[in-house]
A protein has these predicted regions:
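A short, well-ordered alpha-helix in the C-terminal region of glycosyltransferases
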Residues: 195, 202, 208-223
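Short hydrophobic beta-strand element within catalytic cores of glycosyltransferases
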Residues: 162-171
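A structural motif in glycosyltransferase catalytic domains
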Residues: 65, 80-84, 96, 196, ...
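Acidic donor-binding loop of glycosyltransferase active sites
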Residues: 135-148, 161-162
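Donor nucleotide-sugar binding/catalytic pocket of nucleotide-sugar-dependent glycosyltransferases
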Residues: 1-52
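Conserved acidic donor-binding segment of nucleotide-sugar-dependent glycosyltransferases
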Residues: 126, 166, 181-193, 201-207
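Nucleotide-activated donor-binding/catalytic signature segment of Leloir-type glycosyltransferases, i.e.
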Residues: 99, 106-127
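Conserved donor-binding/catalytic core segment of Leloir-type glycosyltransferases
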Residues: 53-75, 81-84
Length: 244
């Protein structure tokens, strides 16, 4: 076995300690994206107007739920469509933006045909322009990844948008550890569209958007960035004990 271990999350450290690993040999490194670029963009983008970012919605000022990532089966986006369909059953209360391409795109568009026709659902396709992705994320009110959530969580929180995903950590990616329930997002019961629907409604009704934006930035600025990762690596190679 290695002398030291770099781990993506605190949960991994807890599990390894339970299996007999020495805590001082386990360094939580977290994960990161292009933090410095995102930090510059976030200040520029949060002053935008929703009508300029979401011209494709009939009412762009409604709360916007976003998913960004590959449209694959493991993401279980059918659950998100079911939940938002239920929320909008009698009147349109929420917009849904899906950004990304993938094998499930045609199936999802077929499932969401009514939402597309009624102007509350939009498929933006794959987008590799980080400023455009930042516009979508920054002006959305909630990011939902109903299957597992990986770097999508870090991407969304980096632009001040809270994250929702399922609650079964045995079926999750490490980055789900960035979500602090009630602070910068929440969890719903795995594979339960009804619970997802209720949790989305409750969150959007009670959320203080500007406070949640600050909460979302906070965890990224503290841990999920290359500057913090460098301090962890330096502690490891110099023989210092882990911070976490």
């Amino acid at each position: 076995l290695a002398h030291k271990h770099l781990l993506y999350e605190r949960r991994a450290k807890k599990l390894m300690i339970e299996h007999g690993f020495a805590p001082d040999n386990l360094y939580v490194f977290f994960n990161s994206l292009d933090y410095d670029v995102h930090k510059v963009l976030r200040h520029k983008l949060q002053a935008l107007d929703k009508k300029d970012v979401f011209p494709f919605f009939t009412n762009p000022y409604l709360p916007v739920v976003i998913f960004i990532g590959r449209l694959t089966g493991v993401k279980k986006l059918d659950l998100l469509l079911q939940a938002v369909n239920q929320i909008n059953d009698k009147q349109t209360n929420v917009n849904l933006l899906i950004v990304g391409g993938g094998a499930y795109k045609n199936n999802l568009e077929e499932q969401g045909r009514a939402g597309i026709q009624n102007g509350w659902l939009y498929f933006a396709g794959a987008c590799y322009d980080e400023e455009e992705n930042g516009r979508y994320l920054s002006m959305s009110d909630l990011c939902v990844s109903p299957g597992n959530v990986g770097l999508t969580a870090i991407h969304s929180l980096s632009f001040g948008t809270p994250v929702c995903t399922h609650d079964n950590m045995y079926h999750q990616m490490p980055e789900s550890g960035a979500i602090q329930a009630g602070h910068n997002g929440f969890f719903f019961k795995e594979n339960d569209a009804k619970d997802l629907k209720v949790k989305i409604e409750n969150w959007l009704n009670l959320m203080d958007r500007q406070q949640v934006r600050k909460n979302s930035y906070e965890i990224i600025d503290k841990y999920y960035n290359p500057h913090y990762q460098l301090t962890v690596f330096n502690r490891l190679v110099s023989g210092e004990s882990p911070e976490l």
